């Protein structure tokens, strides 16, 4: 009988231990079992803002497209490594694309994350939400009860959330790897991502 470790590619060994992607990869593949190995990619779209996949069971997954990875994908010498091979993606087993979770090429990794999200959606649709989890419609940000004066730490520069926090006058910090994604008026809230260990413990909401 195969275990989850048998189905995780060796490339995971080169990945930092206990990362969120590695943990999710292992958990989803193990819980789906044979179903994960039977699912194939039906459609893939690499868009300007989002990369999306649809699996053979109709489940879908998204990932933000890393636009800074596009230049290397359109340069002939590097495009073969940077891009999944067009015309040869549909019909591939979803679990095989998960190898790219551990690659350094941004576009390949984005496609792998979207595929992993589609497999996670498959698990959610099959088994329902975990015990104790309440599912609500609408924007998760609206469901947060953030009291005035409570400090917020945003992991990633999400323009609608930053705009709303600024409108409320809420104190907040934005942990972001790429400061160029922030507008000039948002830069006072920017904190380099590597400072997360000192910023997150000081936040009331993150």
Enumerate the language-model features and the residues they cover:
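Electropositive, gly/pro-rich neighborhoods at or near active sites that engage anionic ligands
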Residues: 2-167
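Structural motif
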Residues: 151, 204-205
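Conserved nucleotide-cofactor-binding alpha/beta core module
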Residues: 159-203
């Amino acid at each position: 009988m195969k275990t989850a470790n048998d189905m995780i590619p060796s490339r995971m060994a080169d990945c930092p231990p206990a990362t969120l992607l590695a943990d999710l990869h292992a958990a989803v593949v193990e819980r789906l079992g044979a179903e994960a190995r039977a699912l194939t990619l039906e459609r893939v779209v690499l868009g300007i803002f989002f990369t999306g996949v649809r699996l053979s069971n109709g489940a879908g997954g998204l990932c933000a497209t890393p636009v800074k990875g596009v230049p290397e994908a359109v340069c002939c010498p590097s495009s073969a490594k940077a891009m999944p091979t067009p015309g040869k993606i549909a019909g591939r087993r979803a679990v095989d694309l998960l190898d790219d979770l551990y690659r350094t090429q941004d576009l390949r990794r984005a496609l792998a994350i979207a595929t992993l999200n589609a497999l996670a959606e498959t698990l959610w649709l099959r088994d329902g939400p975990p015990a104790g989890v309440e599912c609500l419609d609408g924007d998760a940000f609206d469901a947060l009860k953030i009291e005035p004066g409570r400090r917020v730490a945003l992991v990633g520069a999400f323009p609608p959330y930053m705009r709303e926090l600024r409108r409320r006058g809420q104190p907040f910090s934005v942990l972001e790897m790429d400061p160029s994604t922030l507008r000039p008026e948002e830069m006072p809230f920017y904190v380099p991502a590597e400072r997360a260990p000192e910023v997150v413990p000081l936040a009331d909401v993150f």
